[in-house]
């Protein structure tokens, strides 16, 4: 029997929970004005006394809330309670791995990793300088290209005199030969690139019968290094190298330059070019813009110039290439070509770049850089201006590296689609269909079948922001994953279009932690380690883009990361103190995961101003974990019914009837709720106590329901299970506490978009529950638990094996995650920070349970290393 689709399943699983009380929104169900406010104080008496009283003040009355031997004090200065003073013989102690992040471990790591406090003045200076870079983005900043400058310098004077039309470019060549006799990017060396640029400059100087010394030095360099081309990897070849290099070799031969024409590699590449020229479809060459326009100087013997002019860009160039445009001008005299070249020289003075303009690529990569480095919050206005510019040039077939570029680039288009969609722009994934061949494979440019690692990485990252039903995005995901895994198997997994510091590290991270299974601070830490401020780019020649690769970005990212980390460390210490002072450290049936819980929220809502949000979320999660463990390991249904009743009545006088461990739990919850309510009232401008209590009652009812199932060994239907378990996972409860402290005043309408009534909250809970169950059901079954998504699904479908049921659950989860993405990206009425909190809770669940039970077993799993890197280990 086939599994029902996610859409059909969600149609009969209620989006809301079925409770008798209204849903937890304002106005509250409870008459909050009639509920007394209790404030904690403690009176431990003499140090010798065994009796400790906890007092809660109601107005001027002092009520004894806990009396007797072993009663709990919330004061951090009270006597430490011994666990063995109140064992419940019926309470099942669970064998959890002990917490790793104890105070001594934390103190030891922090003391050994001390870094100097961030220089606030330096931070402000860097922010100002980077803002200036964004504001200065015009047509694109890039370094000189000796190769393109040589082609422009070949253009003869229009008056027929024996001089170059652009003499300043010839002078630039004479003055910019490197010490080793070559021309090219001084601080990066690729044999192909250096020889190509050097050959172009030698030819131009020879044409103009000048610079004999430079020509001779260039020839010597060429002879010395030409044999090295055979050993350099093919994907280090500049774009169009197989066309332009052999063409220049032929020209050099006609000029009688003394070069090693008989080298096997040179003979081989000449033959390769001849074969490729025969395969170029002429109908394609002249009818639609293709990447061939980028290197027309290497195709001169086959080009019909009067036809190719029809594909000229509006700015007069051919794919923004000065060299290609110069070649067309020398063959046609086209005035628009000359206008473009004049414009380039007006901009750069005495040289030409590899591309001009390159405005779209520069803006997109700059935005991507600050976002991935985790410093984008400083540049919101600049990012919006850049993205508005990109969007204004967005086309139904994608975009290229420049606004007038008629050939779309898959790397730029994929990055644009992803970033625009993540920032709320309406863009269709249909643009990706432009880049598919007849076999369904994706290519980089029209007319070229080769692909680069960076292009495929950008396409892969783009595929993870797909909406349900976007088949082209799903196909892109599968295609790029296959390509990237294969690239990693190559020892030289380098890129076709760029020389990045650690492209292998970027690919490994993207494949291991895709967007739905990553968190912002994790990605920032990874990219800080992989980002190269001196990375080079490879077009027809090598070039640098200083507004994309710049040490200022990295310096700010490091200062900011370490500063935020130091703030988080102080917060974690306070939370550890609260954990102990609340008596939770003495409970023997629960898990000490304070650091892991704090990591999950600090990796998402990391900004310093969200400290209260982090504290509330962490404390609430700790209480949820404790109560979940209490209900799972309950001594009796009666005890937890009493706990539920106390929460409903909010009645401290029920404490005397509670076992000591339950008393600790209730007092901890009671004081936390009051703390949150008081702070929430200040932030929201209205009473939120009833709202918070209502959330806890809903949460505890689901815990109670699951405890009853366990007690009765009852396996519910899948529908019944999901209705309860998608709430018991506690995602909605936790984020609904947290959203009160995101800096927004929340209306009833906003809350209705993210509370239990919303599809957003339902999908968050559903995906969290399903990933949790897939990784914990076997261990919990061994402890006597009978209800999980897998077991309940098998009850409904006895024809399925456990393995088959597990696959169906994974399919359901992936479909639900796709719907969750759509809710996140399309929600317009919810403030961004509120959306982030909801969505990143779901992402954190996927991260923690990616390989196993990363929460319970966190001390023994990779989560431990994540916690260390984000919370304790500064960036050097």
UniProtKB/Swiss-Prot annotation:
Query: Can you say where in the cell this protein is located?
Result: Plastid, Chloroplast
Main localization is plastid
Swiss-Prot/TrEMBL cofactor(s): Mg(2+)
Gene name, Swiss-Prot/TrEMBL: TPS-mISO1
Keywords assigned by UniProt, alphabetized: Chloroplast, Lyase, Magnesium, Metal-binding, Plant defense, Plastid, Transit peptide
Pfam families noted in UniProt: Terpene_synth (PF01397), Terpene_synth_C (PF03936)
Q: What is this protein called?
A: Monofunctional isopimaradiene synthase, chloroplastic
Which positions does UniProt annotate for Mg(2+) 1 binding? 628, 632
Per UniProt, Mg(2+) 3 binds at 772, 776, 780
The catalytic activity of this protein is classed by the Enzyme Commission as: 4.2.3.44
Q: Which Gene3D superfamilies match?
A: 1.50.10.160, Farnesyl Diphosphate Synthase, Terpene synthase, N-terminal domain
Pathway linked to the protein:
Terpene metabolism; oleoresin biosynthesis
According to its UniProt entry, the protein's GO biological process terms are: defense response; diterpenoid biosynthetic process
Entry keyword annotation includes Acyltransferase: no
Spell out the family assignment given in the record's similarity comment.
Belongs to the terpene synthase family. Tpsd subfamily.
Q: Where is the transit peptide?
A: 1-64
């Amino acid at each position: 029997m086939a599994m029902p689709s996610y859409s059909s399943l969600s149609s009969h699983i209620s989006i809301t929970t079925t409770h008798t009380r209204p849903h937890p929104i304002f106005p509250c169900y409870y008459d909050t004005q009639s509920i007394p406010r209790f404030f904690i104080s403690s009176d431990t008496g003499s140090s010798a006394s065994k009796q400790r009283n906890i007092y809660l003040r109601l107005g001027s009355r002092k009520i004894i809330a806990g009396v007797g031997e072993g009663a709990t004090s919330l004061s951090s200065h009270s006597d430490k309670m011994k666990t063995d003073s109140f064992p419940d013989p019926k309470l099942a102690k669970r064998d959890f791995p002990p917490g790793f992040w104890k105070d001594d471990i934390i103190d030891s790591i922090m003391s050994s990793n001390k870094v100097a406090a961030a220089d606030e003045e330096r931070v402000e200076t860097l922010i100002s300088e980077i803002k200036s870079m964004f504001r200065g983005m015009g047509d694109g900043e890039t370094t000189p290209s000796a190769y393109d400058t040589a082609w422009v310098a070949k253009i003869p004077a229009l008056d027929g005199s024996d001089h170059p039309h652009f003499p300043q470019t010839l002078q630039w060549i004479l003055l910019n030969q490197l010490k080793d006799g070559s021309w090219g990017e001084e601080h990066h060396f690729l044999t192909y690139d250096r020889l190509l640029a050097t050959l172009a400059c030698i030819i131009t100087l020879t044409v103009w019968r000048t610079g004999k010394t430079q020509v001779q030095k260039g020839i010597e360099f060429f002879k010395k290094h030409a044999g090295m081309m055979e050993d350099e990897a093919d994907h280090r070849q500049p774009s169009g190298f197989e066309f332009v290099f052999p063409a220049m070799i032929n020209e050099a031969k006609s000029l009688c330059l003394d070069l090693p024409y008989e080298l096997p590699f040179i003979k081989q590449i000449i033959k390769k070019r001849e074969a490729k020229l025969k395969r170029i479809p002429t109908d394609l060459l002249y009818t639609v813009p293709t990447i061939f326009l980028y290197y027309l100087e290497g195709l001169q013997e086959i080009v019909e110039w009067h036809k190719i002019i029809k594909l000229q860009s509006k700015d007069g160039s051919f794919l923004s290439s000065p060299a290609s445009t110069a070649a067309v001008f020398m063959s046609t005299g086209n005035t628009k070509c000359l206008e473009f070249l004049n414009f380039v020289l007006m901009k750069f003075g005495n040289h030409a770049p590899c591309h001009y303009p390159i405005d779209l690529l520069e803006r997109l990569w700059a935005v991507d850089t600050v976002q991935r480095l985790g410093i984008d919050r400083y540049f919101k206005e600049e990012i919006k201006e850049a993205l508005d510019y990109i969007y204004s040039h967005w086309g139904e077939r994608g975009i290229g590296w420049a606004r007038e570029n008629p050939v779309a680039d898959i790397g730029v288009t994929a990055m644009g689609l992803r970033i625009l969609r993540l920032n709320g722009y309406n863009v269709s994934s249909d643009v990706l269909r432009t880049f598919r061949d007849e076999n369904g494979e994706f290519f980089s440019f029209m007319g070229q079948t080769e692909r680069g690692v960076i292009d495929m990485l950008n396409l892969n990252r783009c595929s993870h922001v797909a909406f349900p039903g976007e088949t082209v995005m799903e196909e892109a995901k599968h295609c790029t994953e296959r390509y990237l895994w294969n690239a990693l198997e190559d020892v030289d997994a380098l890129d076709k279009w760029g020389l990045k510091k650690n492209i292998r590290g970027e690919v490994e991270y993207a494949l291991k932690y895709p967007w739905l299974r990553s968190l912002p601070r994790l990605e920032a830490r990874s990219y800080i380690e992989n980002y190269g401020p001196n990375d080079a780019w490879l077009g027809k020649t090598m070039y640098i883009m200083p507004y994309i690769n710049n040490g200022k970005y990295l310096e700010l990212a490091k200062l900011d990361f370490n500063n935020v980390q130091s703030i988080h460390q102080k917060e974690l210490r306070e939370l550890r103190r609260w954990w102990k002072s609340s008596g939770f450290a003495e409970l023997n049936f629960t898990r000490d995961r304070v650091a892991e819980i704090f990591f999950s929220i600090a990796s998402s809502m990391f900004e310093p101003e969200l400290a209260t949000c982090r504290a509330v979320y962490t404390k609430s999660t700790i209480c949820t974990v404790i109560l979940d463990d209490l209900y799972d390991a309950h001594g009796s249904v009666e005890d937890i019914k009493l706990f539920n009743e106390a929460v409903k009545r909010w009645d401290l006088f029920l404490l005397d009837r509670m076992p000591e461990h339950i008393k600790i739990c209730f007092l901890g919850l009671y004081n936390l709720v009051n703390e949150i309510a008081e702070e929430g009232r200040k932030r929201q401008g209205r009473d939120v106590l009833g709202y918070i209590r209502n959330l806890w009652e809903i949460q505890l009812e689901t815990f109670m329901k699951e405890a009853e199932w366990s007690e009765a060994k009852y396996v519910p239907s899948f529908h019944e299970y999901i209705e309860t378990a998608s709430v018991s996972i506690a995602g909605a409860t936790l984020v609904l506490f947290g959203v009160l402290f995101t800096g927004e005043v929340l209306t009833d309408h906003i809350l209705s978009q993210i509370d239990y009534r919303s599809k957003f909250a339902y999908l968050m809970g559903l995906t969290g529950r399903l990933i949790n169950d897939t990784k914990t059901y076997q261990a919990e079954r061994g402890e006597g638990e009978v209800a999980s998504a897998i077991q309940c699904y098998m009850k409904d479908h006895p024809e399925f094996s456990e393995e088959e049921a597990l696959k169906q659950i994974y399919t359901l989860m992936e479909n639900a995650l796709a719907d969750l993405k759509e809710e996140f990206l399309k929600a317009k009425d919810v403030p961004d920070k509120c959306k982030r909190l909801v969505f990143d809770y779901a992402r954190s669940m996927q991260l923690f349970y990616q390989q196993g039970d990363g929460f319970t077993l966190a001390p023994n799993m990779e989560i431990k290393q994540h916690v260390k890197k984000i919370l304790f280990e500064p960036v050097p």
